[in-house]
UniProtKB/Swiss-Prot annotation:
4-CDP-2-C-methyl-D-erythritol 2-phosphate binds at residues 8-10, 34-35, 56-58, 61-65, 100-106, 132-135, 139, 142. The record marks 34, 133 as: Transition state stabilizer. Homotrimer. A divalent metal cation binds at residues 8, 10, 42. Its EC number is 4.6.1.12. PANTHER family: 2-C-METHYL-D-ERYTHRITOL 2,4-CYCLODIPHOSPHATE SYNTHASE, CHLOROPLASTIC (PTHR43181:SF1). One of its GO terms (biological process) is isopentenyl diphosphate biosynthetic process, methylerythritol 4-phosphate pathway. Belongs to the IspF family. Pfam families: YgbB. The lineage of its organism: Bacteria, Pseudomonadati, Pseudomonadota, Gammaproteobacteria, Enterobacterales. Its cofactor is a divalent metal cation. The gene is ispF. This is 2-C-methyl-D-erythritol 2,4-cyclodiphosphate synthase.
Length: 159
């Protein structure tokens, strides 16, 4: 078994909506990013790539490459997952923690879990997503952006 950890952060800028966990969430602010700015899927992709020792999302999909301008992070996650499976890994489970003062995530989390399970070809019981605030402390608490952490467990497939 192998464990990977991922982290991502994006600052608010421009107008919304925002995309988190593949879900379009109405909000007055947008997130500044080269791709769609999905902090949850970026952190998750990094966790999965880290567990498989395949580097990180920036190495695989550099923000200097115009091909990834405005990229759908679900597509990036699926491509990373294909590469991980090619190395002989299956999914144990993933756990994602979104850190944001606003907008509230609770009503959107079930759909995030559905999308992640679809993209990884796994059961919903293998995907956990939760959200928390920083009690108005730090940059997320001041409403300057959103952060996310993710952990992934991979299992080497039996030969």
């Amino acid at each position: 078994m192998r464990i990977g950890h991922g982290f991502d952060v994006h600052a608010f800028g421009g107008v919304g909506p925002i995309i988190i966990g593949g879900v379009r969430i109405p909000y007055e602010k947008g997130l500044l990013a080269h791709s769609d700015g999905d902090v949850a899927l970026h952190a998750l992709t990094d966790a999965l790539l880290g567990a498989a020792a395949l580097g990180d999302i920036g190495k695989l999909f550099p923000d200097t490459d115009p091909a990834f301008k405005g990229a759908d992070s679900r597509e990036l996650l699926r491509e990373a997952w294909r590469r991980i499976q090619a190395k002989g890994y299956t999914l144990g489970n993933v756990d994602v923690t979104i850190i944001a003062q606003a907008p509230k995530m609770l009503t959107h989390i079930p759909q995030m879990r559905v999308f992640i399970a679809e993209d990884l070809g796994c059961h919903m019981d293998d995907v956990n997503v939760k959200a928390t605030t920083t009690e108005k402390l730090g940059f997320t608490g001041r409403g300057e952006g959103i952060a996310c952490e993710a952990v992934a467990l991979l299992v080497k497939a039996a030969k």
